[in-house]
Curated annotation (Swiss-Prot):
Name by which UniProt lists this protein: Acyl carrier protein
Residue ranges occupied by any Carrier domain in the UniProt entry: 5-80
Gene: acpP
One MF annotation (Gene Ontology) recorded for this entry: acyl carrier activity
Function text: Carrier of the growing fatty acid chain in fatty acid biosynthesis.
GO biological process: lipid A biosynthetic process
Length: 86
């Protein structure tokens, strides 16, 4: 089972890579748009990269609710747990 810390590190890495910024800039409460300068296309690409990395599906409605690293991590944990319990 993947730990929360491992998920956090992977999400930070994805955000860093997608936005072309250093991992040190990607904090747990970093807002993708307000703090890290992501635009709407960046947000779509972040969601797609997260889906691919964790083998999950994120609906458009859910994607709109994910605006920072913490929310992404919590969503991924919920998805993984729901998959395991299905």
């Amino acid at each position: 089972m993947v730990t929360k810390e491992e998920i956090l590190k992977k999400v930070q890495s994805i955000v860093s890579e997608q936005l072309g910024i250093s991992k040190e800039q990607v904090l747990v409460d970093s807002h993708f748009t307000n703090d890290l300068g992501a635009d709407s296309l960046d947000n779509v690409e972040l969601v797609m990269a997260i889906e691919e990395e964790f083998n999950i599906v994120i609906s458009d409605i859910d994607a709109e609710k994910i605006s920072n690293v913490r929310e992404a991590v919590e969503f991924i944990i919920d998805k993984i747990n729901n998959k395991a319990n299905a």
